[in-house]
Amino acid sequence: MQRPTTPLRRSNSRQSDHEEHYPIVESVLDMAIGEQMAELADGMSALDRNLKDLQVIHTNLNNFNESFSTLIYGLQMNAWCAEFHNGPRSCDFARRKEVEEMEERARRAQMQAERDRMAMQQIQETPTRLPSEPSDGDVTYMRNDNSFIIQPPSSYQSQLPSRIPQSSRASRIRPPNSLRPPRGRGLYLRGGSRGVTGGRGSYTGVGRGSGRPASEGTTRRWL
């Protein structure tokens, strides 16, 4: 039994038709694009060389970046872990504290100077009042401190009349009676052998101030 035959593809038929109607001459093709293709091949080879050189440069840069980054990282770790000048130390903290204290003192001094300036400006703007002379009332009050009532002068004491009448004052002064025996026990003689005994009594002096000496205003009285 024979297999059925299949017809040829149309592409093959078209190619055959094209070759039949438009024949290709190899000599003409080589002359037309041969030089351009040679130049293109030279450019592609140069591009390939340049890309290879660029790849080498990129590889070298990556190696340098890795090495340099490792060096920087090691220096940073050394600054924080070992005695490195860039790392903070105890003296750095003390110096920082001193700087902060100096800044605080400068700020306080500036504020004090500003307050003093404002106070001086306020004093200059306030009108000054001249001291006025004391009035008569003030002078009288000041002179009353040494008044004649507290310390009366001697001339005033001598001119001051006595308020006690002369008659009543004379009647009150009684001289002692020599005929009247003084009261008390043991004043009379009781027998010749016992003698004279003195009686009890009191001697009082009453004085009244009337601007006279003490001898004139003193009354002696036996009780």
From Swiss-Prot:
Q: Which terms are listed as keywords in the entry?
A: Cell cycle, Cell division, Centromere, Chromosome, Chromosome partition, Coiled coil, Cytoplasm, Cytoskeleton, Kinetochore, Microtubule, Mitosis, Nucleus
Q: What is its main location?
A: nucleus
**Where is the protein found, in the record's own terms?**
Nucleus; Cytoplasm, Cytoskeleton, Spindle; Chromosome, Centromere, Kinetochore
The Gene Ontology CC terms held by the record are: cytoplasm; DASH complex; mitotic spindle polar microtubule; mitotic spindle pole body
According to its UniProt entry, the protein's GO biological process terms are: attachment of spindle microtubules to kinetochore; cell division; mitotic sister chromatid biorientation; protein transport along microtubule to mitotic spindle pole body
Name the domain of life: Eukaryota
Q: Does the keyword Cell cycle apply?
A: yes
**Where does the sequence pass through the membrane?**
none
- Ranges of compositional bias, category Low complexity: 151-162, 180-191
Where composition is biased (Polar residues), the residues are 1-14
Coiled-coil annotated spans: 94-125
Q: Where is this region: Disordered?
A: 1-21, 114-223
Sequence ranges of Gly residues compositional bias: 192-210
Family, per the entry? Answer: Belongs to the DASH complex DAM1 family.
What PANTHER family would the database entry show? DASH COMPLEX SUBUNIT DAM1
How is the subunit organization of this protein annotated in UniProt? Component of the DASH complex consisting of ASK1, DAD1, DAD2, DAD3, DAD4, DAM1, DUO1, HSK3, SPC19 and SPC34, with a stoichiometry of one copy of each subunit per complex. Multiple DASH complexes oligomerize to form a ring that encircles spindle microtubules and organizes the rod-like NDC80 complexes of the outer kinetochore. DASH complex oligomerization strengthens microtubule attachments. Within the complex, DAM1 and DUO1 may form the microtubule connections. On cytoplasmic microtubules, DASH complexes appear to form patches instead of rings.
Summary of the function given for this chain in its UniProt record: Component of the DASH complex that connects microtubules with kinetochores and couples microtubule depolymerisation to chromosome movement; it is involved in retrieving kinetochores to the spindle poles before their re-orientation on the spindle in early mitosis and allows microtubule depolymerization to pull chromosomes apart and resist detachment during anaphase.
The entry's protein name is: DASH complex subunit DAM1
Q: Please name the source species.
A: Yarrowia lipolytica (strain CLIB 122 / E 150)
- UniProt lists the gene as DAM1
